[in-house]
């Protein structure tokens, strides 16, 4: 038989950001615990609100599965004599296991027949195991921030006030400090705070609802969306929906109710990002827009109670947003009294990082690098690139960005436009922060793209240069995201930049800030980019072996890397693909310690040598011509023509002969052959079926 398991941890309000992971952890922890305990179970569900973490497991077996443990002893041939009597080896084994010799059996293994014992262990009752299991689960939960509360000897996000623990309707007894498990839950803190008993999940869901608690996050999310849409429609608008904000407010409330408020139309004259940031980031309000996406003077907020007088709640929220927007309007007006040009000097008071100097110093560095990049892409861009880089961080000195840090770049763009800057420069000021997330929007202007690359490269090389590199678990300066940003911008714009040159120039500009040798820093930065590029390409679905093969042949030119990978993937269908890969592996093993040598055709003694050499000379000329045009598919087809001569060579010619000059000549031929393959990829890394 099986029963239902129900656990609820009642707490003070846990931060919304902590809850999704905590519920996910509870699910994985109970699955692991039951599996390791050999207790069969069915579906696992989790529920959560700011004041409770809940876990329900269906069809939990009443006892562990029985277990048979087999213990091998000595080989049978040394365990019994010719008459079948047990030897000292067998008797000693039986004694060590606490069994009679008559209980000894035999088992056939790969190494022969051995004596053994088999113990049948009956499973314990589930009830006898759950107390410790659930207690351990609760005390093992981890949060981004936690502390010890009162006399508790373990850390938790917030103080625990009650524990509901039931199996088959009966309490699972355990105690965590002064909190004893029971069969009662509690209602909404303000609307129905009384404790109430429950006996199963169905009753739990019904009674929590009666007490103004909707424990299922997905249901709260649905209610919020539906009611917010209705409220926005009532003022002829629609909700500006945002999944992150929706997730946050879902975990901020136990019983969501909707309030629609308004603000003075004069605030609509502020940049829309200012209004949206004020509402969404700071107040957790949903903005309301018209059908064209223009902001309306309304907002939707999610309340956690049924208000006796909704108008009072509405006025309270309107008062809060009015103060926020009034401050924003003041900042907006005051900031415009000082031009962005004049704010650049103020960046000397803004620390970028104690080891890398001020934001002013950073601007001077990446401004120089941006000019270097512009010279290589299109010198006609240089003046606008220089201006964009100069003003890129100027808004860090404004009151608006000081209050709303999320608006950096956005306010720089707005203030630049208001001051009459070239619109391309204004846009580049904003775009140099892009992409904001992995897979996010990329800069559209060349000016924005170039300054973005320069800024990110300065950060990456700078932090590597002072030995603040990402670890497996931490990347506090978002260097992985910035490296992906550089890669994606270069690929998107198809810029003819090589990583080697870019890193070299960046490190030379940073030289006085470096705390490590420049060459060591350079090597680590390039390897860091290789890792980011490899992960990105594999995550995009490119075969692991093809990615590895192409990157091993060089990855400095990112645009060419993509072309090579695409050509290699198409070439996979060619009959010569796998045979060439196999031959390359074979040659690679032979050539491990060999360095380039000169080929002397006069030393060829086999027809297969001459055939391979002549075919190589013809193919190499055509391959080089194709590579000059970046025509990798054509180059690979030319290489495919070498398949038969290569096969014949390996079938008929012994490379590692005793005669040194002949051996050296044949190695030189192989090296010349496969060096041209390596212009595209290291075929030895290709996974073959043979």
Swiss-Prot record:
The keyword Zinc does not apply. It catalyses: tRNA(Gly) + glycine + ATP = glycyl-tRNA(Gly) + AMP + diphosphate. One of its GO terms (molecular function) is arginine-tRNA ligase activity. The keyword Ribosomal protein does not apply. GO terms for cellular component: cytosol. It is found in: Cytoplasm. Pfam families: DALR_1, tRNA_synt_2f. It comes from the Bacteria. Keywords: Aminoacyl-tRNA synthetase, ATP-binding, Cytoplasm, Ligase, Nucleotide-binding, Protein biosynthesis. Its EC number is 6.1.1.14. InterPro entries: DALR_anticod-bd (IPR008909), Gly-tRNA-synth_bsu (IPR015944), Gly-tRNA-synth_heterodimer (IPR006194). GO terms for biological process: arginyl-tRNA aminoacylation; glycyl-tRNA aminoacylation. Tetramer of two alpha and two beta subunits. Belongs to the class-II aminoacyl-tRNA synthetase family. HAMAP family: Gly_tRNA_synth_beta (MF_00255). This is Glycine--tRNA ligase beta subunit. It comes from Syntrophus aciditrophicus (strain SB).
């Amino acid at each position: 038989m099986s029963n239902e398991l129900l656990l609820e941890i009642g707490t003070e309000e846990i931060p919304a950001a902590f809850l999704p992971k905590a519920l996910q952890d509870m699910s994985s922890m109970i699955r692991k615990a039951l599996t390791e305990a050999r207790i069969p179970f069915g579906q696992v569900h989790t529920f959560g609100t700011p004041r409770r973490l809940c876990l329900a497991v269906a069809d939990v077996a009443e006892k562990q599965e029985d277990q048979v443990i087999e213990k091998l002893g000595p080989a049978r041939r040394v365990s019994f004599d010719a008459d079948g009597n047990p030897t000292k080896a067998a008797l000693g084994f039986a004694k060590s296991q606490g069994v009679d010799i008559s209980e000894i059996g035999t088992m056939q293994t790969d190494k022969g027949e051995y004596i053994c014992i088999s113990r049948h262990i009956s499973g314990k009752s589930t009830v006898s195991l759950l107390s410790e299991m659930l207690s351990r689960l609760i005390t093992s939960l981890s949060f981004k921030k936690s502390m010890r509360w009162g006399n508790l000897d373990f850390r938790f996000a917030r103080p625990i006030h009650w524990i509901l623990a039931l199996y088959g309707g009966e309490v699972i007894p355990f105690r965590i400090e002064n909190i004893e498990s029971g069969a009662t839950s509690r209602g909404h803190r303000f609307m129905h705070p009384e404790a109430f008993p429950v006996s199963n999940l169905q009753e739990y869901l019904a009674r929590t609802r009666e007490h103004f608690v909707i424990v299922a996050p997905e249901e709260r999310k649905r209610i919020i969306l539906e009611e917010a849409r209705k409220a926005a429609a009532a003022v002829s608008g629609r909700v500006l929906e945002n999944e992150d904000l929706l997730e946050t407010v879902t975990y901020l409330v136990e019983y969501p109710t909707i309030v629609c408020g308004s603000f003075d139309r004069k605030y609509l004259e502020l940049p829309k990002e200012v209004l949206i940031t004020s509402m969404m980031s700071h107040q957790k309000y949903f903005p309301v827009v018209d059908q064209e996406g223009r902001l309306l003077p309304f907002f939707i907020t999610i309340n956690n109670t049924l208000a006796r007088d909704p108008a009072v709640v509405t006025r309270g929220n309107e008062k809060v947003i009015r103060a926020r927007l009034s401050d924003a309007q003041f900042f907006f007006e005051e900031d415009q009294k000082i031009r962005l040009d004049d704010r650049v000097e103020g960046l000397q008071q803004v620390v970028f990082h104690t080891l890398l100097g001020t934001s002013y110093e950073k601007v001077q560095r990446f401004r120089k690098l941006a000019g270097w990049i512009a010279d290589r892409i299109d010198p006609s861009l240089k003046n606008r690139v220089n201006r964009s880089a100069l003003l890129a961080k100027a808004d860090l000195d404004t009151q608006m960005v000081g209050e709303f840090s999320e608006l950096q770049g956005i306010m720089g763009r707005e203030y630049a436009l208001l001051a009459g800057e070239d619109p391309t420069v204004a846009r580049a000021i904003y775009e140099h922060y892009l992409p904001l997330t992995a897979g996010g929007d990329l800069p559209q202007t060349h000016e924005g793209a170039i300054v973005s690359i320069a800024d990110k490269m300065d950060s990456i090389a700078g932090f590597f240069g002072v030995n603040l590199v990402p670890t497996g678990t931490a990347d506090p300066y978002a260097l992985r995201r910035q490296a992906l940003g550089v890669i994606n911008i270069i690929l998107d714009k198809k810029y003819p930049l090589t990583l080697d040159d870019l890193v070299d120039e960046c490190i030379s500009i940073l030289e006085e800030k470096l705390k490590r040798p420049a060459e060591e820093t350079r090597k680590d930065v390039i390897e860091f980019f290789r890792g980011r590029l490899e992960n990105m390409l594999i995550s995009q679905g490119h075969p692991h072996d093809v990615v590895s093969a192409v990157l091993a042949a060089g990855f400095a030119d990112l645009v060419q890397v993509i072309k090579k990978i695409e050509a290699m993937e198409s070439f996979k269908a060619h009959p010569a693909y796998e045979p060439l890969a196999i031959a390359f592996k074979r040659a690679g093993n032979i050539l491990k310690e060999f360095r380039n040598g000169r080929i002397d055709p006069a030393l060829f003694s086999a027809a297969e040598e001459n055939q391979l050499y002549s075919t190589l000379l013809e193919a190499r000329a055509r391959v080089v011509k194709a590579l000059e045009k970046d025509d990798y598919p054509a180059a690979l087809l030319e290489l495919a023509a070498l398949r038969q001569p290569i096969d014949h060579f390996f079938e008929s010619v012994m490379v590692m002969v005793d005669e040194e000059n002949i051996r050296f000549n044949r190695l030189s031929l192989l090296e010349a052959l496969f060096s041209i393959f390596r212009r595209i990829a290291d075929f030895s890394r290709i996974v073959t079926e043979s």
